[in-house]
Amino acid sequence: MIAYIKGLLAADGPGWVVIDVNGIGYHVSIPSTTQLPALGHEVKLFTHMSVREDGIQFFGFAKEDEKECFLLLLNVAGVGPKVALAVVSHLPPSNLRSAIAIEDVNQLVKVPGVGKKTAQRILLELKDKLKGMAAVEHSTLQQSVITTGSGDEAVEALLALGYSQGEARDAVKKAQKSAPEEDLSALIKIALKELAPSR
């Protein structure tokens, strides 16, 4: 299995690149949000190779966690590479984890090609499979409720979901203003909803 491809960026377009590795050009499908260097500069993409009857296709990601999300999405019934790539393109890993943690169907149905049934299936199946991501982080949210009731714990829970210190603090502050009487679990959910449209 090819874990990554590293070479010179020979060509690019909407959702694809060609990487020149020692004179061989690899055509790789990528998320539309991938930040690329200028043509002729070195690029490294973590890859997944899809082998089908009609040929071989490479999917590449600038970050390993994007690739992990893509592979996990492929395990969901009815989700193929095209839909999985669309999800990763529209929802960064932190947003996908947040959507799973709060079972936010609306975030997923905004992705082109993802209907309500597919979104519900993704949430249902990945809630159990994302042990290193959604499940552990959702557990962190629950532990935060048990350990303390402070805003700092809410911030820490959001940091565990991949948000920056500034994003987490701002979201918690807004959540506390809009719902000062809520318990920590509800506070975190409100903060996640504040963060969801920001990415």
Swiss-Prot record:
SMART domains from the UniProt entry: HhH1 (SM00278)
Keywords: Cytoplasm, DNA damage, DNA recombination, DNA repair, DNA-binding
Renumbered residue ranges of the record's region Flexible linker: 142-152
Main location: cytoplasm
GO biological process, one term: DNA recombination
Pfam families xref list: HHH_5, RuvA_C, RuvA_N
Compartment(s) of residence: Cytoplasm
GO molecular function, one term: four-way junction helicase activity
Keyword Cytoplasm: yes
Region (Domain II): 63-141
InterPro entries: DNA_helicase_Holl-junc_RuvA_I (IPR013849), Hlx-hairpin-Hlx_DNA-bd_motif (IPR003583), NA-bd_OB-fold (IPR012340), RuvA (IPR000085), RuvA_2-like (IPR010994), RuvA_C (IPR011114), RuvA_C_sf (IPR036267)
Annotated region (Domain III), positions in chain: 152-199
Entry GO terms, CC: cytoplasm; Holliday junction helicase complex; Holliday junction resolvase complex
Residue span of region Domain I: 1-62
UniProt record similarity statement: Belongs to the RuvA family.
Stated role: The RuvA-RuvB-RuvC complex processes Holliday junction (HJ) DNA during genetic recombination and DNA repair, while the RuvA-RuvB complex plays an important role in the rescue of blocked DNA replication forks via replication fork reversal (RFR). RuvA specifically binds to HJ cruciform DNA, conferring on it an open structure. The RuvB hexamer acts as an ATP-dependent pump, pulling dsDNA into and through the RuvAB complex. HJ branch migration allows RuvC to scan DNA until it finds its consensus sequence, where it cleaves and resolves the cruciform DNA.
Cross-referenced HAMAP family: DNA_HJ_migration_RuvA (MF_00031)
Entry remark concerning the domains of this protein: Has three domains with a flexible linker between the domains II and III and assumes an 'L' shape. Domain III is highly mobile and contacts RuvB.
Subunit structure: Homotetramer. Forms an RuvA(8)-RuvB(12)-Holliday junction (HJ) complex. HJ DNA is sandwiched between 2 RuvA tetramers; dsDNA enters through RuvA and exits via RuvB. An RuvB hexamer assembles on each DNA strand where it exits the tetramer. Each RuvB hexamer is contacted by two RuvA subunits (via domain III) on 2 adjacent RuvB subunits; this complex drives branch migration. In the full resolvosome a probable DNA-RuvA(4)-RuvB(12)-RuvC(2) complex forms which resolves the HJ.
Name recorded for this polypeptide: Holliday junction branch migration complex subunit RuvA
Native organism: Desulforamulus reducens (strain ATCC BAA-1160 / DSM 100696 / MI-1)
